[in-house]
């Protein structure tokens, strides 16, 4: 596990993730606290698919792939899954810290509903749940495409195309509540509307399929 952390969480990657969150919290303006999730989801998705694209391809770049192939498939997959988990936990921590940075730097107006002060806490936990799915989906998808083409830049580019389509007014009109970014396009005025969860279910289902397909891709392309 320690070795996987050193490989997948290098200092440069940690540094640019933290810097990204810091800059975002300074330049992305929000007026109310319930807008923070919208301000963070799409940019954090970009961070996720750039951060995780080299989860496996770094073995190819560093020319360790020949040694890697000597390991059993089970061991190789466990290693990849651990690296993905480590990166996703780090990104989720960055997402949580980013939420706090918006309060620190921009001091948005707290959007209080009938639940009083507890509504802000509930809103944060809902945000974290949505971000866990978003980060997981884009990180897994980026790694899958990178493994398929043995190139991290193809993984990043493929995800960027999908990101551009779904994170748009056109994407919202076409997919509605089933959009990958349904959390960002949700109705802020209706806190009881959880139809955006459909989009997150889509992310989870695609993520599971991607993880299931990964061993076959590694076996053929690894």
Regions found by a protein language model. Name each.
Residues 1-15:
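Aromatic- and glycine-rich beta-strand/loop motifs that create alpha-glucan
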Residues 21-54, 81-152, 187-190, 198, ...:
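Secretory targeting signals
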Residues 30-32, 122, 147-222:
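Terminal transmembrane helical anchor/hairpin motif
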Residues 49, 78, 162-163:
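Small-residue-rich segments of transmembrane alpha-helices in multi-pass membrane proteins
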Residues 53-89:
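Helix-loop-helix units of permease transmembrane domains in multi-pass membrane transporters
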Residues 60, 64, 101, 105-113, ...:
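Membrane-interfacial segments
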């Amino acid at each position: 596990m320690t070795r996987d952390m050193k490989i997948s969480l290098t200092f440069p990657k940690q540094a640019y993730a933290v810097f990204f969150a810091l800059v975002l919290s300074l330049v992305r303006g929000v007026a109310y606290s319930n807008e923070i999730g919208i301000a963070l989801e799409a940019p954090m998705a970009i961070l996720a698919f750039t951060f995780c694209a080299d989860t496996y391809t770094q073995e190819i770049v560093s020319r360790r792939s020949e040694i890697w192939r000597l390991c059993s498939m089970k061991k190789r997959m466990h290693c990849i899954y651990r690296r993905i988990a480590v990166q996703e936990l780090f990104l989720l921590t960055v997402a949580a810290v980013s939420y706090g940075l918006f309060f620190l730097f921009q001091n948005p107006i707290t959007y209080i509903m009938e639940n009083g002060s507890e509504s802000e806490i509930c809103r944060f936990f809902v945000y974290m749940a949505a971000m866990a799915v978003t980060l997981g989906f884009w990180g897994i998808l980026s790694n899958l495409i990178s493994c398929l083409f043995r190139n991290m830049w193809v993984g990043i580019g493929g995800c960027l195309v999908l990101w551009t389509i779904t994170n748009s007014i056109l994407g919202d009109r076409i997919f509605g509540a089933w959009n990958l970014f349904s959390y960002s396009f949700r109705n802020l005025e209706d806190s009881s509307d959880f139809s955006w969860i459909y989009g997150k279910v889509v992310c989870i289902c695609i993520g599971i399929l991607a993880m299931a397909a990964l061993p076959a891709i590694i076996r053929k392309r690894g």
